[in-house]
Amino acid sequence: MSLQICVMTPDCIFLNKEVDEIILPTNTGQMGVLSNHAPLITALDIGVMLVRTQKDWESVAVMGGFALVKQNQITVLVNEAESKETIDPQEAEEAFATAKQTLEQATGQKEKVEANFAFKRARARYQVIGA
């Protein structure tokens, strides 16, 4: 038995297909979902969502949101989603290096929060390109 996943952003339905397994970046860590999973709703952090079909794994950078798991259907609502095909590897690598440096140099509370947010976004995109 498989899972039906639908990933939606404010702009579009980003992904809608049958999968065998999904790993979600929740606020408390990664959470795997297989068929016949118990119903739940969970908040998603900025990170990499992994989707497995029979053939291989697909990585998607998600920028926070939530997921609903119910009766082998997973509905994922996120602020933004990007796949490997839509990310420029050079730009992602540069953004990751810049965000890391900015986070290390942040001093004030507000500056640290903003730098951490930018770092998490850049890291997710960098991880998706497989660097």
UniProtKB/Swiss-Prot annotation:
Keyword Thylakoid: yes
Entries under Gene3D superfamilies matching the protein: 6.10.140.480, F0F1 ATP synthase delta/epsilon subunit, N-terminal (2.60.15.10)
Superkingdom of this protein's organism: Eukaryota
SUPFAM superfamilies: Epsilon subunit of F1F0-ATP synthase N-terminal domain
Record's bilayer topology term: Peripheral membrane protein
Location(s) in or outside the cell: Plastid, Chloroplast thylakoid membrane
One GO MF term: ATP binding
GO cellular component terms, A-Z: chloroplast thylakoid membrane; proton-transporting ATP synthase complex
CDD domains: F1-ATPase_delta
UniProt KW keywords: ATP synthesis, CF(1), Chloroplast, Hydrogen ion transport, Ion transport, Membrane, Plastid, Thylakoid, Transport
Signal peptide: none
InterPro entries: ATP_synth_F1_dsu/esu (IPR001469), ATP_synth_F1_dsu/esu_N (IPR020546), ATP_synth_F1_esu_C (IPR020547), ATPsynth_dsu/esu_N (IPR036771)
Function in brief: Produces ATP from ADP in the presence of a proton gradient across the membrane.
Assembly and oligomerization: F-type ATPases have 2 components, CF(1) - the catalytic core - and CF(0) - the membrane proton channel. CF(1) has five subunits: alpha(3), beta(3), gamma(1), delta(1), epsilon(1). CF(0) has three main subunits: a, b and c.
Family affiliation: Belongs to the ATPase epsilon chain family.
Protein name per its UniProtKB record: ATP synthase epsilon chain, chloroplastic
